[in-house]
Design a protein with these regions (language model features):
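Short, ordered loop/turn segments at secondary-structure junctions
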Residues: 43, 112-113
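Short, flexible loop segments at the rims of nucleotide/cofactor-binding pockets, characterized by
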Residues: 14-16, 56-57, 83-89
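Hydrophobic/aromatic ligand-binding patch that stacks against planar heteroaromatic rings
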Residues: 29, 99, 118
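Active-site neighborhoods of divalent-metal-dependent phosphate/nucleic-acid chemistry enzymes
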Residues: 74-107
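Residues at secondary-structure transition points
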Residues: 22, 38, 60-63, 87-94, ...
Length: 138
């Protein structure tokens, strides 16, 4: 299978980091092993900001968070995405769409209802974790 580029939203990446069990972790591990994650500075900054929230302290150590961010940073495809277009109700979601479009990503994977129900973008398929697992054969 050809290596594909995927943008995975912050909530899924954090879910995968907090629990090695379940669909988000299975997806992230599969993408890291066989495909490529895509980040823009805005999408990575959102992940960095959220993963350090104190509410996650009892689930993941600071060292593990640093290691995870380092691994993502080192293995990712980075895109220059300026001010995003207006695609969704939530402006923060637009950064993920913009990164996916700039990278010509295969999918944007999200559990966010706003993204999953965003007006159709001909160039981009927004899918759930389970849809991505099925499509990628994981």
């Amino acid at each position: 299978m050809t290596s594909l580029k995927l943008v995975i939203d912050t909530n899924i990446l954090i879910s995968a980091a907090l629990s090695a069990q379940g669909a988000p972790a299975q997806l992230v591990m599969g993408v890291l092993a066989r495909h490529r994650l895509v980040f823009s500075q805005a999408t990575f900054d959102e992940l960095r900001t959220r993963i350090y929230r104190p509410k996650f302290d009892r689930y993941i150590s600071l060292d593990d968070r640093e290691r995870l961010l380092g691994d993502f940073n080192a293995s990712a495809i980075w895109v220059e995405a300026g001010e995003p277009g207006r695609y969704c109700r939530d402006r923060d979601d637009d950064h993920f769409i913009e990164a996916a479009l700039k990278a010509q990503a295969h999918n944007l994977v999200s559990g966010d209802k706003d993204l999953l129900e965003a007006p159709c973008l001909q160039e981009l398929q927004v899918v759930s974790v389970h849809q991505a697992l099925e499509a990628l054969g994981f």
